[in-house]
UniProtKB/Swiss-Prot annotation:
Disulfide bonds: none annotated. Its main location: cytoplasm. The keyword Coiled coil applies. It comes from Homo sapiens (Human). It holds the Pfam family CCDC113_CCDC96_CC. Forms a complex with CFAP184; the interaction is required for functional activity in cilia. Interacts with HAP1 and PCM1. GO terms for cellular component: axoneme; centriolar satellite; ciliary basal body; protein-containing complex. This is Cilia- and flagella-associated protein 263.
């Protein structure tokens, strides 16, 4: 069944059940038909584009999108299509899937070519604009440099010598030098342009000769080229196989290299741990050596004290018993006398405090009497 027949059957079934369906289903049906119509429209435009490439412009039939008909004509055309679909006469033959696939592939290839041309044009325009920007930057740098030189060489001298003839001559000389340099630059650019034109002519001539030589190739040359192409393809296949083998060997080498790298990483970690442990052991050894030196010093001091004590012990002579008893009794008597004198001193201090208080009272009383006496006079 073709697209026209399916569309006519759908339209008949939709018209027959249009009064029976609710509004929601009608909206869904309209949306579905709109999607189908948009897909068919895109496909029809692609077919018309391909058909337009095959036929000359004067022999092309008008496109469906270019045909402008009224609503009545469209209804009449639709009714005529329905009658044709009902009778089953004059059915058009649709495209097969392979033909549609071929058309789509050609359309995709054309789109890729257009995209490539567009990209090439865009790159060329971009390079052109970049060259213009670069030239503008170069010109701007030259103008800035010339302005700086003019300000440094001319304006400073003019500001110092206003109204003098030397300043005017200097400006004129600067302008003449600038014109001379510009003429020299113009001549260089003209010569370069001439040489570039000559090179362009040579390249065009070589290209034309190559095209003529390529057009003059015969069947024998094409057969030779086919043979060489086959040989090159065999060589490329062999090189691809070698490249595959090299990739496999490279993969194995990378695996071995990764294994050795992991081993090296582990060895480096062990080395770092051992290095840290060696540093800790060295610090511990230095600490032990310091403690050993301190112990040696303490031992030497203890030996010296021990020798001194032994010497004192050897020289020590205990007193006799009676002498010791007498000294002990004398010591006890002295302690008793010390305690007795301490009590006497405390008693004397207390009596001294009492006498001081009495003296202070007497002194205060005397001062009051003197004050009263002086006041009575």
């Amino acid at each position: 069944m073709t697209d026209d027949e399916s569309e006519s059957v759908l339209s008949d079934s939709h018209e027959g059940s249009e009064l029976e369906l609710p509004v929601i289903q009608l909206c869904g049906l309209v949306e579905e038909l709109s999607y189908v119509n948009s897909a068919l429209k895109t496909e029809t435009e692609m077919f018309e584009k391909y058909y337009a490439k095959l036929e000359p412009r004067d022999q092309r039939p008008p496109r469906l999108s270019e045909i402008k008909i009224s609503a009545a004509d469209y209804a009449q055309f639709r009714g005529r299509r329905r009658s044709k679909s009902r009778t089953g006469m004059d059915r058009g033959v649709g495209l097969t899937a392979d033909q549609k696939l071929e058309l789509v592939q050609k359309e995709v290839a054309d789109m890729k070519d257009d995209l490539r041309h567009t990209r090439a044009n865009a790159e060329r325009d971009l390079q052109h604009h970049e060259a213009i920007i670069e030239e503008a930057e170069i010109r701007w740098s030259e103008v800035s440099r010339e302005v700086h030189e003019f300000e440094k060489d001319i304006l400073k001298a003019i500001s110092k010598k206003k109204g003098s003839i030397l300043a005017t001559q200097k400006v004129m000389k600067y302008i003449e030098d600038m014109n001379r340099r510009r003429d020299n630059m113009k001549e260089k650019l003209r010569l370069k342009n001439v040489s570039l034109k000559v090179q362009r002519k040579k390249m065009l001539l070589q290209l034309r000769q190559k095209e003529e030589v390529s057009e003059a190739l015969h069947d024998v040359d094409f057969q030779q080229l086919k043979i060489e192409n086959a040989q090159f393809l065999e060589t490329i296949e062999a090189r691809n196989q070698e490249l595959t083998q090299l990739k496999l060997s490279s993969g194995n080498t990378l695996q071995v290299l990764n294994a050795y790298k992991s081993k090296l990483h582990k060895a480096m970690e062990i080395y770092l741990n051992l290095d840290k442990e060696i540093l800790l052991r060295k610090e511990l050894l230095e600490k032990i050596e310091k403690e050993t030196l301190q112990v040696e010093e303490d031992r030497a001091k203890a030996e010296a004290v021990n020798k001194r004590l032994r010497k004192q012990l050897a020289e020590f002579r205990a007193p006799q018993v009676m002498t010791y008893v007498r000294e002990k009794i004398l010591n006890a008597d002295l302690e008793k006398s010390i305690r007795m004198w301490e009590r006497k001193v405390e008693i004397a201090e207390m009596s001294l405090k009492g006498h001081r208080k009495a003296w202070n009272r007497m002194k205060i009383t005397n001062e009051q009497l003197q004050a009263d006496y002086l006041a009575g006079k």
